[in-house]
Design a protein with these regions (language model features):
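A glycine-biased, small/acidic residue-tolerant capping/turn segment at secondary-structure junctions
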Residues: 142-151
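Acidic/His-rich, divalent-metal-binding segments that scaffold phosphate/diphosphate chemistry
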Residues: 1-98, 104, 108-112, 119-132, ...
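A short hydrophobic/aromatic micro-motif that marks alpha-helical segments and, especially, helix-coil
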Residues: 63-64, 117-118, 148, 178
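Terminal helices and disordered tails flanking the catalytic cores of nucleotide-processing hydrolases
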Residues: 154-191
Length: 191
């Protein structure tokens, strides 16, 4: 099955905007920390919510029910998904990463972007992804199912030894990149 089309009312465009913003934030965090520029941070940010796309594509009615429950109960989607699917979108993303033979460090970042303290192979990549996810939300790149998912990831900031004062410039860069993100999405959807 292709992930390109969705029959559900879930706003896939907002998800991709958020994913691109998360990728850009992850890349900037990695640069500020002088981490290797190997593309893994950008890739983890871009793909971190791929499990949502899979769940929405394969089980659109169930996914909409999960989104509805999350909104109504004011809980994060990743807490509601296991009630319906037996696992959350992060775990689904990890399963997809394994199926696609993605590097294990990247697969772990997909699986642990909400639970970076549980990462074993590369806690650093998982923490960068979690923090980038948060910064993308703060910069205004969210979606309707993000209820509660944008809590400040204190453990990630501490693990990365990043001063929260350094976040504002990343947030501002993301806000200024809105047109560029929309252009990237337009180019992809036109292809």
């Amino acid at each position: 099955r292709s992930f390109a089309k969705s029959t559900s009312p879930y706003d896939r465009n907002q998800l991709w905007r958020h994913s691109l913003a998360t990728a850009m934030a992850a890349e900037r965090i990695a640069k500020r920390l002088s981490l290797e520029a190997d593309g893994s941070h950008f890739s983890a940010g871009l793909l971190h919510d791929i499990g949502k796309v899979a769940l929405d594509s394969v089980y659109p009615d169930n996914f909409q029910e999960a989104v509805k429950r999350a909104v109504e109960s004011q809980r994060p989607l990743y807490e509601v998904e296991p009630e319906i699917f037996g696992m959350d979108h992060a775990e689904v993303g990890g399963v997809l990463g394994e199926h696609w033979n993605l590097p294990p460090l990247l697969t772990e970042a997909l699986r642990r972007h909400h639970t970076p303290d549980q990462a074993m192979l590369s806690p650093q990549l998982a923490h960068v992804t979690a923090l980038a996810n948060y910064l993308a939300y703060v910069a205004g790149y969210g979606e309707s199912s993000n209820v509660g998912e944008h809590a400040y990831p204190m453990s990630s900031a501490m693990a990365l030894k990043m001063d929260p004062g350094k976040f504002q410039d990343i947030i501002e860069e993301l806000q200024q990149a809105s047109e560029r993100i929309d252009a990237m999405l337009g180019a992809v959807s036109a292809a």
